[in-house]
Amino acid sequence: VFTLNGFPYGGFHRQVVKDQVYAPDWSLKTRLRYTLRLTSILAELLPDEMEGSISTLPLSYKPWFQENQPIRANVFYKASIYIARVVAKMVRIRTETGKLLHLDLEPEPDGLIENAAEVVNYFKAHLLPIGGAYLAKYLEIPLAAATAFLLEHVRVCYDTCHFAVEYEDPISVFKQFEAAGIKVGKIQISA
C-alpha cells in the first residue's frame, strides 16, 4: 500500500453526500486526529522503497463561508496549523524510518481551494507563513527548514476531472505549481 484516500472521513457511505463529504473539515481537530492516524497506518504499510501519499480535502467547503470572511480566515489559519502538525509527524517518521510521506490537497469545485491559483495563494498566504512559523517553533528549527519540510510533505492531488471542470490547462497548472515550488504528489485520472 502506497496511497490512502483521506478525503472522506471514516466509513463514508451515505445516500446523499453533497457538502457532508467535507466534514469534518481542516478547521477541526477531528480531521487532524483522523489524518494523524492515517499517517501512522500508511507508515506501517508502506514498502521501504516507495513514497506514500494521503489525499485530503481542499481544507473545507467554500459555500459554508461565502458570507463570513472572519470565519473563512480562521479556517485557513487553523488548517495551516493542523497541516503543519501532520507534517511534523511525517518528518519524524522520515527521520526514524527513512519513509517519505506526503499529504496531498485535492482541489475541486466548491472546495475552499478550487483551482491552481487558489492552491498557490493558499501556500503563499497561509500554509508557508502560518504553518511554517508553527512548524519552526514546534520542531525548534529555522523557518527556512520548516518551509522546506512543508513543501516536501504537502503536495497536490491533481484530479483530471476537477481541474477540467475549472477549465484549467494541465500544462499551465503544472507550470504554476512548479514556479511556486509546489509538488504534485498524486494524479487521479477520472472523468
Residue ranges of model-derived segments:
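Short, well-structured secondary-structure segments
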Residues: 1-6, 52-56
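Repeat-solenoid scaffold signature
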Residues: 158, 163-168
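Active-site acidic/histidine proton-transfer and metal-coordination neighborhood
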Residues: 15-155, 165
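A short alpha/beta connector and helix-capping loop motif
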Residues: 166-191
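Short glycine-enriched loops at secondary-structure junctions
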Residues: 5-11, 60
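Conserved, mostly hydrophobic/aromatic
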Residues: 1-4, 35, 119, 159, ...
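Catalytic-core regions built around general acid/base machinery
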Residues: 1, 86-89, 176
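Generic beta-strand/beta-sheet core signal
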Residues: 106, 157, 187-190
